[in-house]
């Protein structure tokens, strides 16, 4: 029997709607939100701002910080929402090591739509020029991973409804 979801990780490439979906879920569920971007050290942000893709060595400390944040909340019996690209299986495996059940929602959108979204996004350090490297790195969820893929819809509300349906299904599967 599966356990109920303690941590919901919204994953995917930049511009797929992770932040908007997380805010909508926070408003509906009241769970605290962690933006992975807030866990990056300054050196990582500087690299990405200059259009330089991060290496695994850049990512491991950042991902461990996210995992530790989720585990700390779990010790307080607090369910969480996290936004994190989590592009590779190995990154998701590390995040899955958090205390409590970690459930991934892979938000999927078309590259041209992502370019459009990123062109209109203000105040974000991630340039759209890094999208191709993110797609090259992306390893979609495998059947044996705890999560589902949700198409990032035309409106944030439609995406939110699709995520809620997936979360309800995951929770009912927990029995």
Residue ranges and their predicted role:
Residues 1-6:
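Extreme N-terminal, non-catalytic leader segments
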Residues 10:
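Hydrophobic anchor at the beta1->P-loop junction of P-loop NTPases
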Residues 13:
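P-loop (Walker A) phosphate-binding loop of NTP-binding proteins
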Residues 18:
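Conserved lysine of the Walker
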Residues 23-68:
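Conserved substrate/cofactor phosphate-moiety recognition/catalytic segment
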Residues 57-99, 107:
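Glycine-rich phosphate-binding loop used to anchor ATP phosphates in small-molecule kinases
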Residues 98-117:
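Conserved phosphate-donor/acceptor-positioning beta-strand/loop module used by diverse small-molecule
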Residues 120-163:
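Small-molecule kinase domains that catalyze NTP-dependent phosphoryl transfer to phosphate-bearing small molecules
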């Amino acid at each position: 029997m599966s356990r109920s979801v303690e941590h919901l990780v919204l994953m995917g490439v930049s511009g797929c709607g992770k932040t908007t979906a997380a805010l909508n879920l926070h408003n509906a569920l009241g769970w605290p939100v962690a933006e992975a971007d807030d866990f990056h050290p300054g050196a990582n942000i500087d690299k990405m701002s200059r259009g330089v893709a991060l290496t695994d060595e850049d990512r491991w400390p950042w991902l461990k910080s996210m995992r530790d944040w989720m585990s700390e909340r779990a010790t307080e019996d607090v369910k969480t929402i996290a936004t994190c690209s989590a592009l590779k299986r190995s990154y998701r495996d590390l995040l899955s090591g958090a205390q409590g059940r970690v459930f991934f929602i892979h938000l999927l959108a078309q590259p041209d739509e992502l370019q459009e979204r990123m062109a209109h996004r203000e105040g974000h350090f991630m340039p759209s020029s890094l999208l191709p490297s993110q797609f090259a790195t992306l390893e979609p969820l495998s059947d044996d991973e705890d999560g589902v893929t949700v198409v990032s819809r035309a409106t944030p509300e439609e995406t939110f409804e699709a995520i809620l349906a997936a979360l309800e299904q995951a929770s009912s599967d927990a029995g």
